[in-house]
Structures are given as C-alpha cells and as structure tokens.
Amino acid sequence: MAEEQARHVKNGLECIRALKAEPIGSLAIEEAMAAWSEISDNPGQERATCREEKAGSSGLSKPCLSAIGSTEGGAPRIRGQGPGESDDDAETLGIPPRNLQASSTGLQCYYVYDHSGEAVKGIQDADSIMVQSGLDGDSTLSGGDNESENSDVDIGEPDTEGYAITDRGSAPISMGFRASDVETAEGGEIHELLRLQSRGNNFPKLGKTLNVPPPPDPGRASTSETPIKKGHRREISLIWNGDRVFIDRWCNPMCSKVTLGTIRARCTCGECPRVCEQCRTDTGVDTRIWYHNLPEIPE
C-alpha cells in the first residue's frame, strides 16, 4: 500500500510541476469551481467540464487529468486537449490508446482507513479524490512544449475562496523514488513552505531564537586571575634493600614539578617559603644528600 501511495504522490507532483510551468488562467479556475459546485449539488449527474482553452488563456497544450471528479465514478476529464490532438497524448500519460470517455472503470476512489482496515466515516474530502488507476509508475505528465523538468510546486491549505496557496520557490524532486523516500524528498519543501507561511502571517512566532556564541579564540585566551597557591608539598620515597624498606620524607616547593627520586627541587616563582612547619621538624633536612635533577642520582 505504501508503494501505491508513493506512486500516486509522484504522479501528483508531476501534475503540479506541469501546472507550475504554465499556470492555468483565472477564467479556467472559475469555470472549474462552478462545475465542482454543480457536481456537489447533483452527484448522480455527470457534467462535462472540459472546454477548449483559447490561445493564451492556458498554457497546457497536453492533457492533464483533472483532480475534480464525481464520487459515482465518471469519465476522466481532459483539460487543454484541442481538436487536433489524438490518442498519442494518452500514451504520453501511460494510458492505452482507447476511448478515455468510456473507460469509467479506470477511475479509483480512495477513502481513509484506520489501522484495522475499516473505512473511516465522516470524512467528505477523501471521497472526492479521484485518481486514474491506469497510470504507470514511471509515466510523466507533460505541461507544454517548454515544460520545466526541474521545477516543482507545493500546494498548501486552500483559503476561504477555495484557491490553493502555491510555493514557486521549492526545490526539485527526483523522478524516481520509493515509498521510504517520500518523507526525505518532501522534507526540504515542507520546511521551505513553513518558513514562507510563517513570514507571511501576522501572528507572533512561537519560541525563541537560539543564539549560539562563537567559539573562543585561542590567541586571545587569558590566563587565570587566581594565583597559584604558594607553599610546600610533602613527598615520600620508598627504597627496597633486601628485606628492608627505607622511607624518606621531605618537602618541595609547590611550584616545582613532581619527579622521581629524592630530589630537592628549587622554587621557580620566587614566592614559596624556604621552610614550612613540617620542614622545621624534619631532622634529616640538613644531613640528607640532595640531588637537583635526575642525572645527578648515582645508579
């Protein structure tokens, strides 16, 4: 079912592309609306609504299936088919060259179904959507001699007058896509349509704009204003000698690096005190052999 819906969506987009290439005139739209009103009042009576367009009133020179149809299943209406056009145009649409006016069984009426497969009642708009079932999945709809292959249009919600809001700045749609690609293909156009609609209305925008600060410049990074704590740190050295362990403890300035070995480090900042409370009670501070770097330690 998803594949069939994708096929109908594609056919609809192709028809919209043809309409955007050469839009229908206002006179033809008024006639279609009048015919639709008559059909809605008398659903059992079939009325022919297609007429030959005058030169310049409509740019569609090839037939395009009308989206207006009776729920009783009438003949498909062809708009813009002149007296000189034959059934070759039907082959362009993917329809076999036969009498289109007599192929009433080629129309298929779609309803809305729930997850259990039952038809949902009370929805009137879905009953009037008539789709030509004889269209091939790879067929294209022509929109004139100078049709645009890479153009597309989104139809928005109809206004109170019955006319649809169109978006002529949409991105092109790929010719062949699967059912899983419908959401991806239409995502950019939906966002563009929402952006245009939100810009055109007078209602305040909901939410707030997210302002992302720029990344920090490493060249302008400032040092911390908090000074490094000055003082001494206590270091411990364990030496194994056979079955004995010698433990040595001493202090080094806080600003010096921690290294291996019994090393008496020197203050690099010039602010660390010479002795602390622990240094004063250290009896071996004067008799201990100090090394100021690793190469001085004998192996």
Swiss-Prot record:
Keywords: Host cytoplasm, Host-virus interaction, Inhibition of host innate immune response by virus, Inhibition of host interferon signaling pathway by virus, Inhibition of host IRF7 by virus, Inhibition of host MDA5 by virus, Inhibition of host RLR pathway by virus, Inhibition of host STAT1 by virus, Inhibition of host STAT2 by virus, Inhibition of host TYK2 by virus, Interferon antiviral system evasion, Metal-binding, Viral immunoevasion, Zinc. Zn(2+) 1 binds at residues 232, 251, 276, 279. It is found in: Host cytoplasm. One of its GO terms (biological process) is symbiont-mediated suppression of host JAK-STAT cascade via inhibition of host TYK2 activity. Residues 41-99, 134-168 are annotated as: Disordered. Residues 134-145 have a biased composition (Low complexity). Residues 110-120 are annotated as: Interaction with host STAT1. InterPro entries: Paramyx_V_Zn-bd, Paramyxo_P/V_N. GO terms for cellular component: host cell cytoplasm. Residues 146-160 have a biased composition (Acidic residues). The record marks 240, 246, 248, 250 as: Interaction with host STAT2. Zn(2+) 2 binds at residues 255, 267, 269, 272. GO terms for molecular function: metal ion binding. The keyword Metal-binding applies. Interacts with host IFIH1/MDA5 and DHX58/LGP2; these interactions are involved in the inhibition of the host type I interferon signaling pathway. Interacts with host TYK2; this interaction inhibits the type I interferon signaling pathway without affecting the type II pathway. Interacts with host IRF7; this interaction inhibits IRF7 translocation to the nucleus. Interacts with host CHUK. Interacts with host RELA/p65; this interaction inhibits the nuclear translocation of NF-KappaB. Belongs to the paramyxoviruses V protein family. Plays an essential role in the inhibition of host immune response. Prevents the establishment of cellular antiviral state by blocking interferon-alpha/beta (IFN-alpha/beta) production and signaling pathway. Interacts with host IFIH1/MDA5 and DHX58/LGP2 to inhibit the transduction pathway involved in the activation of IFN-beta promoter, thus protecting the virus against cell antiviral state. Blocks the type I interferon signaling pathway by interacting with host TYK2 and thereby inhibiting downstream STAT1 and STAT2 phosphorylation. The N-terminus interacts with host JAK1 and STAT1. The C-terminus interacts with host STAT2. The C-terminus also interacts with host PP1. This is Non-structural protein V.
